[in-house]
A protein has these predicted regions:
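A detector of single, family-specific signature residues
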Residues: 1-219
Length: 219
């Protein structure tokens, strides 16, 4: 059962790990015909030598790339949200049990699958995530500048653009409450803010360019 799979395999579940993959295959009767641990480099080689079948995986890191590769080999690769797979887990959790749950889940007619992303779609997703992180960093810097000013009794009206426009004047004229060390600190933060603005603007342009004419994901 663990190494031999003379029976025709109808469906396979793959539990994706960083370096190893746990694979469980069922025959047409639902009996386990394959139960093996493969290295990352073995996955495509092994599956290239097997008849086309249904293959399920959780939609985790690396799953979209592998799904595309397995589809090129002729397999019907499908991705599922991990939360929907959990309902099919049996017994104590381990990697092979996870693969068993995946192969059970992928055969369910009511399963809600995740569309396999193209390379461009993954690039677009990455750009959005990086931009979101930079926007969050910028917000943190702006809040810190406001907090430092308020601690010294200097209030600036709300709004990113307002603070950007008024900050140079505040630093130049409020030397009565802003000592030189604090002015330098805020000027350094303002420099970080400007650099983040430039990076965010550049990423926004990349996102707009890549998003134009983006093909729909395959299901």
């Amino acid at each position: 059962m663990s190494g031999k799979h003379n029976s025709v395999i109808a469906a396979i579940g793959i539990d994706i790990g960083k370096n190893s993959f746990h694979v469980v295959g069922l025959d047409g009767r639902g009996a386990i015909a394959l139960r093996q641990k493969w290295s990352r480099g073995q996955v495509e080689t092994r599956l290239a030598n097997m008849p086309a079948c249904l293959i399920g995986m959780e939609a985790c890191v690396g799953a979209h790339h592998l799904s595309r590769r397995l589809r090129l080999l002729g397999h019907d690769a499908r991705l599922m949200p991990a939360k929907y797979v959990r309902a099919y887990s049996k017994g104590q959790k381990n990697d092979f049990r996870d693969a068993e749950a995946i192969v059970e889940a992928v055969q369910r007619p009511t399963m809600k699958f995740v569309a396999t992303k193209t390379g461009d779609q993954l690039d677009l997703q990455a750009l959005h995530r990086v931009r979101e992180r930079l926007v969050s960093q910028r917000t943190g810097i702006i809040n810190q500048i406001r907090a430092f000013l308020l601690e010294r009794g200097v209030a600036v009206r709300q709004g990113l653009r307002v603070l950007r426009a008024e900050l140079p004047g505040v630093l130049a004229t409020r030397c009565d409450v802003l000592a030189p060390p604090m002015v330098r600190i805020i000027e350094d933060l303002a420099g970080d803010w400007r650099r983040l603005d430039e990076r965010i603007e550049a990423l926004s342009g990349e996102i707009e360019t890549l998003d134009a004419g983006m093909p729909a994901a395959s299901g």
